[in-house]
């Protein structure tokens, strides 16, 4: 092999390795919640406190009387703790509702909750879902998984 061919092979090898590292980094972003991942949960808690707590409560308690419509006809922000119905939804539904807002998913449903697609990355949304799920007791987590599996 000539020196020029060796050099070209080395360059191609470096490019391939670099591309592989880049793909590995891209895959490191969460594509599902992981309520047992302390780092992801901490990230989710920080994002929740900044973006969600003003409506859903700093303790995930939701707004008072959340089961009854507001004067504008819309529903108050529900709790995300075990007393609410968040755990009745699949992980994908929780992600989608956060990303595009409930109104975009349910035809005719009006909600004060906006979608966060322009404010949060997908990884941030999964981190928030991870944080919320991390606060649920094991029996609620298990019920959510059983209820929402296809």
Task: Please name every model-derived segment.
Residues 44, 48-58, 113, 128-132:
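The canonical Cys-X-X-Cys-His
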Residues 2-12:
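Bacterial N-terminal signal peptides that target proteins for export
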Residues 68, 78-79, 97-126, 135, ...:
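Axial heme c-ligation environment in periplasmic c-type cytochrome domains
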Residues 23-47, 142-150:
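Electrostatic cytochrome c docking/interface patches
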Residues 10-20:
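Bacterial N-terminal signal peptides
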Residues 45, 61-95, 115-120:
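Gly/Gly-Pro-rich "capping" loops immediately C-terminal to redox-active cysteine motifs
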């Amino acid at each position: 092999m000539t020196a020029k061919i060796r050099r070209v092979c080395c360059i191609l090898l470096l490019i391939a390795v670099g591309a592989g590292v880049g793909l590995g980094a891209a895959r490191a972003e969460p594509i599902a919640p992981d309520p047992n991942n302390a780092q992801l949960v901490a990230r989710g808690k920080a994002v929740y406190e900044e973006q969600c707590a003003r409506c859903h409560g700093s303790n995930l308690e939701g707004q008072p009387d959340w089961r009854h419509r507001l004067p504008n006809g819309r529903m108050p922000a529900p709790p995300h703790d075990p007393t609410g119905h968040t755990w009745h939804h699949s992980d994908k539904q929780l992600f989608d509702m956060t990303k595009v807002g409930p109104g975009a998913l349910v035809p005719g449903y009006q909600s004060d909750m906006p979608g966060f697609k322009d404010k949060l990355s997908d990884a941030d949304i999964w981190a928030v879902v991870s944080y919320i799920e991390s606060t649920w007791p094991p029996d609620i987590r298990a019920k959510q998984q059983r209820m929402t599996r296809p």
